[in-house]
Amino acid sequence: MDPLFQQTHKQVHEIQSCMGRLETADKQSVHIVENEIQASIDQIFSRLERLEILSSKEPPNKRQNARLRVDQLKYDVQHLQTALRNFQHRRHAREQQERQREELLSRTFTTNDSDTTIPMDESLQFNSSLQKVHNGMDDLILDGHNILDGLRTQRLTLKGTQKKILDIANMLGLSNTVMRLIEKRAFQDKYFMIGGMLLTCVVMFLVVQYLT
């Protein structure tokens, strides 16, 4: 397990270094860097699945520490995934603004019944208002993604905590009644998390409907 863990840990640090390259990359190379980072993140998630299996096969006196190390790696890579998505969202928003600005400047607006040109200032003001609405919706969607990512991270943390509690309970020889109570609480937490995710989606939908 240790060699695979060290490789994965090293790869996480390499991705953190690559994230800094995104801010300085030009338009031609930024997509290449993004794809490289995403491919590395996907590979780490695959390795984490293998590490989880290996950690469960560790001796009882090493199992808890092994799972803690795997959980920490999982937490780090999930934050890297969120950071990459946030960067891509900001980049897409900038590119969309640039395209709309270029289209607006290259387009001549005329009325239907005369050759009177619509004042450019009014057109720019209208476009600016639309852009603010789009940016507000994009920010709302991004916040929703971050909330859902946080809920997924919380679920993984609760799942890992449940495993640790059950392992400790087995070592201490707790009764079946106590074990069932622990499992019941974990089951209830799962439904609370799902309810929170659904509520977030409903709120996002209602706000988007209101803005549009």
From Swiss-Prot:
GO terms for cellular component: cytosol; endoplasmic reticulum membrane; endoplasmic reticulum-Golgi intermediate compartment membrane; ER to Golgi transport vesicle membrane; Golgi apparatus; Golgi membrane; late endosome membrane; membrane. It is a single-pass type IV membrane protein. Gene3D superfamilies: t-snare proteins. CDD domains: SNARE_GS27. Part of a unique SNARE complex composed of the Golgi SNAREs GOSR1, STX5 and YKT6. Interacts (via IxM motif) with SEC24C and SEC24D; mediates GOSR2 packaging into COPII-coated vesicles. Interacts with BET1. A motif (IxM motif) lies at residues 118-120. It comes from Homo sapiens. Pfam families: V-SNARE_C (PF12352). Residues 61-107 form a coiled coil. The lineage of its organism: Eukaryota, Metazoa, Chordata, Craniata, Vertebrata. One of its GO terms (biological process) is vesicle fusion. SUPFAM superfamilies: SNARE fusion complex, t-snare proteins. Involved in transport of proteins from the cis/medial-Golgi to the trans-Golgi network. InterPro entries: GOSR2/Membrin/Bos1, SNARE, v-SNARE_N_sf. This is Golgi SNAP receptor complex member 2. The keyword Kinase does not apply.
